[in-house]
Amino acid sequence: LNGGYGISGVKDDKVSYEYTPTRNSSTWVSLMYGKKTQWILFGGYVKNFGTKDDLLGAKNGYAPAANLYFSKNSFSNMNQMWRLTPTVIRNIGKFAIGLEYELTSVQYGEYKTIDGVKCIGANGLAEDNLHWITNNRVQALVKFTF
């Protein structure tokens, strides 16, 4: 999931840093109906709100992107995303066959280069040139339970 922290300052000892957390919201729901034929609808939304405090080196609304750290599988330039996944599964005795369609759309912002330094918004958000990238995926399921 989306999360991390940023460097917001240098402590009085001039060696240690002060940190600020990233803030985000993640909401997911899964609804299922039926037994022999199962209808499933999964949906979710994630919003990145940036860091609590401005990042170290912030000026004119931008800060060095190197002062922002995200978890390994996250993207620091992601602004928001949503996912919708309808699924149908037919249970036939010990067999089950299913089909799932997944639609995921993510809004990314671009980094800005200032004096040769890759920068992000002072609050840790990449909000320049926001654009959506959408992915479609279809998966099939065949299962035998013994």
Identify the residue ranges that each predicted region occupies.
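Low-complexity, intrinsically disordered Gly/Pro/Thr-rich segments
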Residues: 118-129
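Outer-membrane beta-barrel and related beta-rich outer-membrane complex signature
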Residues: 51-57, 109-117
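Transmembrane beta-strands of outer-membrane beta-barrel pores
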Residues: 43-49, 92-94, 103-107, 144-146
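Outer-membrane beta-barrel "beta-signal"
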Residues: 132-146
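Repeated loop/turn-to-beta-strand initiation elements of outer-membrane beta-barrel proteins
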Residues: 37-41, 94-99
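Short acidic-glycine motifs
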Residues: 112, 128-131
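Residues on the lipid-exposed face of transmembrane beta-strands in outer-membrane beta-barrel proteins
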Residues: 27-33, 86-90, 99-101, 140-144
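Detector for outer-membrane/organellar transmembrane beta-barrel domains
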Residues: 1-78, 82
